[in-house]
Amino acid sequence: MVLPGGLLTRKEEPVPLKSICVTLSIREFVAGVSATLNYENEEDVPLETFFVFPMDDDSAVYSFEAVVDGKKIKAELQEKRKAHSIYESAISNRRQAFLLEEDKYSRDVFCCNVGNLNPGSKVALTLKSVQELPLEADGALRYVLPAVLNPRYRGSGSFEDSCLDMKTPVVPLEDLPYTFSMFATISSQHGIERIQSNCPFSPTEYLGEDKTSAQVSLTDGHKFDRDVELLIYYSEVHTPTVAVEMGQPKDNPDGFMKDPSAMVCFYPNIPEAQSPVICGEFVFLMDRSGSMQCPISKQDKSQLRIEAAKETLLLLLKSLPIGCYFNVYGFGSSYEAFFPNSVQYTQQTMEEALRRVKLMQADLGGTEILTPLQIIYREPSIAGHPLQLFVFTDGEVTDTFNIINEVKRNRLRHRCFSFGIGEGASTSLIKGIARVAGGTSEFITGKDRMQSKALRALKRALQPAVEDISVSWDLPRGLSAKMLSPEQTVLYKGQRLIVYALLSGTMPPVEATGEVYLKYTLQGKNLENRVTFSLQPKPDDNFTIHRLAAKSFLRAKDMGFRDTPAKDKKDVLKISIDCGVISSQTAFIAVHKNLNKPVQGPLTRRDVPRPVLLGAASVMPQYLGCALPNAKSSYFSPASQPTRTSRYEGMPDQRDGCKPCRPMVSKDLCALVFGDNHLVQLISLQNADGSWYLDENLAGILGKSLEDLLAAVPVKILERETMMWASKVDTCDIDT
C-alpha cells in the first residue's frame, strides 16, 4: 500500500526499495542479464539499507554501478575483507557507499548494502551478469530468474557472518512492497520456433520474417510472486559451434584477459547402449524436513513438496531392474533408513519399500543433509553394483559448500543425480552436488511434473558411462590452446558439453581455421566429434566468453570464503579480479567520493523484506528451530540384517522362479495417495518384473471391465498364467 511515508511492511517500517527492473538478452545459449534496483529515501533521516536476494548459481556477475541523483559511480571488485573495510570507513565518515557480495556459504545468495542514503535521494543500482543456459530434454533452452529466497536452515553450525543471518524480514509473496518488470530479447541464427513462460507474458513479437530475433516482456502489474521461467525453442539446437573472442592485451598485459578465448559447444551423437545396465546400488535420499510441507509453487491447488516427492519415488522404485540393490533414506534434523543396508530388488522388497513410502511425512525437523550423506558413503560398496545416489530436496540449507565438498570427496565411487523441489530451491546446492559427482540436476516448480525428469535421470543411470573423454586441438603453427574448463568425466546421450580455452601465440591470417576434437569410448567403441571453426576473434565489449570461462574455473576451484583450499585461494582471487567476476573471495565496492558534504544526521537501518512462499511461514518454526536428536532409526532388528552380498533373508528371489506376491495396493488406495493421476496409479500396481495382475483394480484404473481385459489377452498367455498380464511397460520411456 502507498502512504505518505512510502511503501510499508507489516511492521509499518518504510521500504526504500521501490522496484526491480530486469533486461534480458539471450543470444543462442548465453544469457546477458542487467538488473536495476531502484531505491528512494522518503524519510527525514539518512538510511543504511540491506537487501538479500537469490541469483542462479551459474551467473557470472561482472559489473556493479550506482546512479545517485543522476551521478554514475562504478564499483570496483576488491578482495572481500578490503571491500568491507572500505565500506565501513566510508560509512563512519558519512560518505555514501554501496557493497555487493556473494554469501560466504552459498554462491546463489547475494547481499546488497546501501550506506548513507540522504533524505530525498534516489539511487539506481545495476548489476550485470552472464550465464550459460541449460538444455532441457525436449530441446528447450531454460532461463530462470530466481524470485523466492526461502529461509535457509542453519543447523548446529556457526553461520553468523552469512548474508542470511542479517534476519531480514520476510513477507508473503502477495505482500511484496516493491514492483518488478522484465523485458527480454532473444536471437538465434537458427530461428526461433516459440517461447513459453510460467508467468503472464506479452505476445511474442518477431523482428523480421526469418524469426531469428524476438522480444517478449512480463505483462504490466506482474507481482514477483514466483521464479520467472522462460523456455526458448530454436529450430536447431544440436549443431556444434565454436566462438572465438578477442582479448584485452593493452589493459591486461599479463592477466587472464590478455589472450583471445574460445567457447566450444559439442552435442555428441552418443548412440543408445546396446544393453542397458541392469546392476547397481540405487540409494534415494529424500528430504523430510518441515519445509517440505510447503507447496511447490504459489499457484492454486499446488501440490505439496513432500507429496510430489513421494509420488516420484514410487515411480522410481517401480522402474528399477530386477537384481539391483536399493535403499531409501529420509532426512531432516534426524534421519531414517528403510532397510539397515541396501537390499536386493525383488517383488517383496519393493512392496516393503512402497509401504514405507506411504507413511513418509515432512516431520523430521530441519534440513541437515550432511550426516546422512556421510552415513551412505561409509557403507561398504557392493561388488559389481556401482552406487547411484538420487537426492530430492528443497535445498533450504546454509552450509552449501560443506555438502558439495562431501559429495566431491566421494565422486570416484558414485554418481549423484539431484532434484530441487519447489520455488526457492538452492541452485548452488542442487547443481553443485550433481556437477562434482558426474550426474545431472533438475528443478521442479509450478505445473512442472517431477516424474518425467526423475525417470530420465534413472534412464541415464542405467546407461553405461561414456569413458576416456578427451578434447584436443589442431591449430596453425605458433598458436596453442590452454584448457580452462574442469575435466569432464561423464556424458549422457542428449547432453551438451561446453569447454573453454585461452588461445595464446600468434593469430594467423584472415582465412585460417582450426579444428577441435571430442573423443570418447562407449562399450569398447571409440567415438569422435569434431568442429572446424574460424580463427578470427570477434570483439565483445562485455567479454562474455572470457567471463563465462572464468566462471567455469571458479565453479571448480571456489569452495566458499572459508573452505577454499589455500593452494586454490590465490588463483581464485586473481582470476576473479582479472575478469571482474565476483567470487566468494571478492566483493564490489563503490564510494561516492564527490559528495559535496558529509551526510548529516543519525543513520537509520532499513532491511528490505524478501518473499517467501505462501505456507512457508506456517512451518518455519518447525524447521528453523528444531533440534531433534541425531539418531538413525531402522524398521528391522539387527538380527534380521542381511549381508551386503546376500539376498534379502527370508524372501524368495523372482529370478529363482518364484511368482511375485499379490500386490497390496488397491485402486481406492491408489486414488487416495496419488489423486487422479491415472498414469501414476497404473504404475503403482505394477509388479517388480513389469507385469500386472489381471484384476478389478487394474481394470478400474484403465476404465475397463475385467471381462474386457481378459478378452484382450492372447489365449496362450492366459493358458500360461491366468492371473498376470506379462506385457511390460518401460516406465523409463514414459514422457521423456
Language model: regions and residue ranges:
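An acidic, Ser/Thr-enriched
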Residues: 63-104, 117, 126-285, 448, ...
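Asparagine-centered strand-capping/turn motif at beta-strand->loop junctions
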Residues: 24, 38-45, 53-55
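Proline/serine/threonine-rich low-complexity linkers at boundaries of modular beta-sandwich domains
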Residues: 10-15, 461-469, 473-476
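Preference for long, amphipathic alpha-helical scaffolds in soluble/luminal domains
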Residues: 614-736
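Short, charged loop segments at secondary-structure junctions
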Residues: 86-97, 248-250, 283-304, 314-324, ...
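Von Willebrand factor A/integrin I-like adhesion domains
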Residues: 352-358, 371-374, 424-468, 579, ...
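N-terminal, polar/Ser/Thr-rich
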Residues: 1-28, 730
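Short, solvent-exposed loop/turn segments enriched in Ser/Thr/Gly
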Residues: 31-35, 569
